[in-house]
């Protein structure tokens, strides 16, 4: 079962270029240095169209990448850059004629219900329309159609969040530590996508060197770093990385095996 993964956004909560910054990366003419807020789209062949997070930039990301359908949404956590595009999902409700399933851990589901109370409160007046979201709390592996989804526990600072594995592909953003139980879930990967914010230490994100250490332990065929800030220029940083490791960029497409033969 093959799928196409598209990086809708590979930047931080600020995005790149960052407002008011005149550094070399923020002024770069390399399109790979223009990073919107973090999200990916997974389009499974003859299967579901899956969003991972609804970023602040979702509307433009969907238009740029010509996404015509969303069958499910996976949330990693509830920080603004990962959820604040949720209202834009309502256009897919209109086109598809029904609610869209969404999946999140217990804390994130609670945060979504509070932050978007107008969506989840049935007494809210419709006005110009509200998203229809069928929100499920994740308690373990689950299926979206024929696609097996394996949640991967992560830490974003002290906060537990989720990454996801589909087949031989894993997406681990916004993390600075993997608990012991996460490592066995990453065995046999072909492609690993991993948070790598910058070179300087950060309390809630992997640095480039820390992310390289994780990749060395997991040993996928290929690793892509995401959630990069303006301290990492694409061309310069990419040239310094070892074989089998690259920076992702907005619009990058990967072909993955989304089957469940790894379980």
Task: List PLM regions with ranges.
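A conditional alpha-helix N-cap/helix-loop micro-motif detector
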Residues: 33, 55, 175, 201-208
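Anionic group-transfer/hydrolysis microenvironments
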Residues: 11, 55, 176, 197, ...
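Binuclear metal-dependent hydrolase catalytic cores
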Residues: 1-172, 181, 238-262
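Thr-Gly-centered strand-to-loop micro-motif
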Residues: 151-152, 172-174, 194, 225-226
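Binuclear metal-ion centers of metallo-dependent hydrolases, dominated by the metallo-beta-lactamase
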Residues: 139, 179-263
């Amino acid at each position: 079962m093959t799928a196409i993964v598209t990086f809708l956004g590979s930047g931080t909560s600020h995005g790149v270029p960052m407002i008011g910054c005149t550094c070399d990366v923020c002024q770069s003419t390399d399109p790979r240095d223009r990073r919107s807020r973090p999200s990916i789209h997974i389009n499974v062949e003859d299967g579901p169209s899956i969003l991972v997070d609804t970023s602040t930039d979702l509307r433009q990301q969907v238009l740029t990448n010509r996404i015509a359908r969303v069958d499910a949404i996976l949330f990693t956590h509830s920080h603004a850059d990962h959820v604040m595009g949720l209202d834009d999902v309502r256009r897919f409700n209109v086109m598809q004629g029904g609610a869209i399933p969404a999946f999140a851990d217990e804390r994130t589901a609670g945060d979504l219900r509070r932050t978007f109370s107008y969506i989840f409160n049935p007494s809210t007046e419709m006005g110009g329309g509200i998203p229809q979201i069928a929100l499920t709390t994740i308690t373990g592996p689950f299926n979206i159609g024929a696609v097996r989804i394996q949640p991967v526990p992560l830490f974003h600072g002290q906060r537990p969040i989720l990454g996801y594995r589909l087949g031989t592909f894993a997406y681990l953003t916004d993390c600075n530590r993997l608990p012991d139980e996460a490592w066995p879930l990453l065995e046999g990967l072909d492609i690993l996508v991993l948070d790598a914010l910058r070179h300087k230490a950060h309390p809630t994100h992997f640095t480039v060197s820390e992310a390289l250490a994780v990749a060395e332990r997991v040993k996928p065929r290929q690793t892509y770093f995401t959630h990069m800030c303006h301290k990492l220029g694409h061309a310069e940083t990419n040239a310094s990385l070892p074989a089998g490791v690259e920076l992702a960029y907005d619009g990058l497409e990967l072909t993955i095996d989304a089957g469940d033969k790894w379980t």
